[in-house]
Amino acid sequence: MQKSTEQAGEWQEIWERRGALDSFIDWGRTTYNHFFRRVLRRYLNTDSTVLELGCGRASLTLSLAPEITSLVGVDISDVAVQQASEFAREHHILNATFAIDDCTKLALTEKFDFVWSQGLLEHFEDPIVVAREHYRMLKPGGTALLSVPYRYSYHTLWYLLTRPKMLRRFWPWTEQRFFNGRQLLAVGKEVTPYARVFFLHPLPLGIIFLELRRPVTE
C-alpha cells in the first residue's frame, strides 16, 4: 500500500506540472499518436470495448473513441483522470469513462475486447504483475497490447544523460527500466504462451510492443 501511495504521489506531481518541457512532451505525444493509431486500428472495430491502463490524459484512445463501442480509462492520478474526463466532455465524447485505479490490483470487474497501455509497464518493480492485470481484464478472444520504450534507442540515452541531480528535471517521468525484445517477451510468456513482441515503425521511434492474446477457450 505504501509503495502504491508513493507512486500515486509521484504521478500526481507529473500531471500537475506544466512548463516548456511539458509542452515539448505534448508535441512528441501528438506525433507518436499518429503512428500508434495505425497499430491500434488493426485490433479495433465498431463493436470493440477498450480499456486503457495508466491512461493519463488519454489523448490517443479518446481520438479513437468514435470508432469503437466504449472506452474505459484508469490511472492512479486523480489529476490525470480529471484531465481526461474534461477533454472527453469538451469534445462531446459520450462513450468514454475514467476512474482512479491501481494497475497492480484493478478493482474493475468488467472484461474488455482490447486492453492497451502506453509507457506504463517500465515504471513497475514487478512488470509481470502489471502484465497479468492486462491479461486478466480480457474477454475470451481478446488482446492486450503494451508499448514500452526500447532499450537500444534514444529513450535510454536521454534517461542516462539526465541521471545527474542537476539534470534530473529534464527527465519528465519517474524512474524506469528499459526492455529489449527478449526481456519483454519473457514477461509476456510468464502470463500466457500466446505472447509476442514487435516494433513500432519507423524503428527510430524506439518503441516495442508486447501483445498478449487470450484464447476463446482456455
Predicted regions span which residues?
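Conserved N-terminal segment of class I S-adenosyl-L-methionine
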Residues: 1-107, 114, 118, 131, ...
